[in-house]
Amino acid sequence: IQTPAAKYEQNGFWSDHWVYILDMVDTYLMVYPEKESHLLWDSAKVPFFMSPAYIKPRSERYVLVPNPDRSGTSTLRVLNAVVSETDTEYSLERYNEMKEIMNSSSYFADHTGAGSIWQRSAKDKDVFKVTIIAKLLMLGTLKFATLDPQGMGIEMEGGKPGWNDALNGLPGLLGSGMPETYECLRLIRYLRSSLEAYAVPHGSNKDSRPVVVPVEFHEFLDTIKGALTVYYSSDQKYDADIEYWTAASNAREQYREAILITFSGD
C-alpha cells in the first residue's frame, strides 16, 4: 500500500516544485485513459502537508534597505520570506498542533525521515482530505492568484526560485518566473477540459460531478473572482493592475491565515 509522505528540507519553497503534480496525472492517464473520472473524483482522497515552515505576509517579508546605487535612499527587497519552527515569531498554535499530531497514535514516520504531519480538520481532529480534482483546482487557483503585478510571472514568494541555483538572488528582488506561468496555464487548461467533460454546470450532463472544496478556499475563490470582475471592468492600466494584485495578495494571505492551524472541516 502506498502512503503519501512529505518532508520540508531547507529555508524556503522552490517556486516550481508543484509543476510535477500534473505530470503524475498525465503519466497515469497514459496507461489508464479510461479512468480519468475515477482518478479525479473517486480515487483515494489526498491530504495537505503541514510544513514546519510557512510564508510570511508581505508586511513582514518586504523591507527597505539602503540603495547601493544611490546614497541616502532606500530600495525594496524581500528578506527572510519564510518562518521556521526554530524562529521566535513562529506561531505557537501551529507548533502545538504539529506536536499533537506527532504524538497521536495515527502518526507515521518512514525510514527516510519524512512524516505524515497532515493538516487536520477542526471539526473532528481527523486528517483533512479532498479529491484529486479539488486539490488540482485549489493549486491552479492559488498559483493564478500569485501572478506578479504585471500579470506575467508567478512570484517567488517562498524565498526560492525554480530549479536553477543561478537565480537564487532573484526572490529577494521581488522576482517572478514565466516557466511557472506556462505550467499554471497548462494546469488551468487541463482543469477546464476535465470540468467540461465531467462537471458540466446547470445539470446539462446527468452524470456531472460536483467539486467539493474547503469553505476557506471557496471564500478565497469568490474573492479572486470579485477582484477579476473589478479589473475587467476597469481601464486595465497600471493602477488597475496594482489594485488587482493587491486584492489577490490580500486574499491569499487571508486564506493562509485561515488555515494556518487547521481546516474548519466545512
Where are the regions a protein language model picked out?
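Acidic, mature catalytic/reactive cores of soluble proteins
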Residues: 1-266
